[in-house]
């Protein structure tokens, strides 16, 4: 990169339990880029893909800044039980401090940019997924997807995001074209030839950068006119926050349907949180119960945003005492943070 310091990315672990006679000519390569808070989510996401796609070859790549022995043991078990190849990389984030981050998203959101660059040295195509994406169907069609000259196949973001993106990025041409970056199927050679990682980092380092969703916004700016749009089934966006207004907790069925292939649980509340006890997260629970993480306790609130979400959901679930206590905890953290 011309204007960005070299980033250290090292392979730390790799497991290959594929059968000796496996045909590797057709393989769906899947990558994740996360910090320590999302590692377990990656494990369950991988499990969900395996459960629904045992008929195809799968290779998984994870880029993270921190790992732990517990994760190593569980991901190795997942690889062995399902005859997978899984490769882990560690990224040194010291030189990423110049990039913007938010209260909700850490600088791990940029790991995908380095994943595209690194894996492009050995792979032709790659399916990138956020850790909060759960598979509930057959995605093998991607193996034979014609990109028709496009750099990436993506799914348009939900309608409320379209006009906001146009206003935020001052680009009317993005209306109806703004995509969600949680599911991206990429031609890595075209990405590299266009030097898109370098260009993205250059934009992100600019003093004029006012992106609300830095990684997603910059990818939309750079890939404008270079994308192929996939149907909503490949990135069905569902926000657990919507359960706060749905007393029946059945409205998710209007979005997550029989034809849905990939569910993207966006928002601060994730399906692995202790208070996410709704029918809409059953697809995550199915994968969890079939994974090495099945005996782990659900995640409790850590950040102030999670504390805020927790008390609201507890009250909706009629856990009034625990909800009030959680609300007090949130207010105390909010007050003492000032």
UniProtKB/Swiss-Prot annotation:
The source organism is: Escherichia coli (strain K12)
Q: What is the lineage of its organism?
A: Bacteria, Pseudomonadati, Pseudomonadota, Gammaproteobacteria, Enterobacterales
**Motif placement: DXD 1:** 130-132
What is the protein's given name? Answer: Lipopolysaccharide 1,2-glucosyltransferase
As its record notes, the protein acts as a catalyst of: UDP-glucose + [lipopolysaccharide] = UDP + D-glucosyl-[lipopolysaccharide]; alpha-D-Glc-(1->3)-[alpha-D-Gal-(1->6)]-alpha-D-Glc-(1->3)-[L-alpha-D-Hep-(1->7)]-4-O-PO3(2-)-L-alpha-D-Hep-(1->3)-4-O-PO3(2-)-L-alpha-D-Hep-(1->5)-[alpha-Kdo-(2->4)]-alpha-Kdo-(2->6)-lipid A + UDP-alpha-D-glucose = alpha-D-Glc-(1->2)-alpha-D-Glc-(1->3)-[alpha-D-Gal-(1->6)]-alpha-D-Glc-(1->3)-[L-alpha-D-Hep-(1->7)]-4-O-PO3(2-)-L-alpha-D-Hep-(1->3)-4-O-PO3(2-)-L-alpha-D-Hep-(1->5)-[alpha-Kdo-(2->4)]-alpha-Kdo-(2->6)-lipid A + UDP + H(+)
Q: Which GO terms describe its biological process?
A: lipopolysaccharide core region biosynthetic process
Family assignment from sequence similarity: Belongs to the glycosyltransferase 8 family.
Q: What is the documented function of this protein?
A: Glucosyltransferase involved in the biosynthesis of the core oligosaccharide region of lipopolysaccharide (LPS). Catalyzes the addition of a glucose (glucose III) to the outer-core glucose II.
Annotated residues that bind Mg(2+) are located at 130, 132, 264
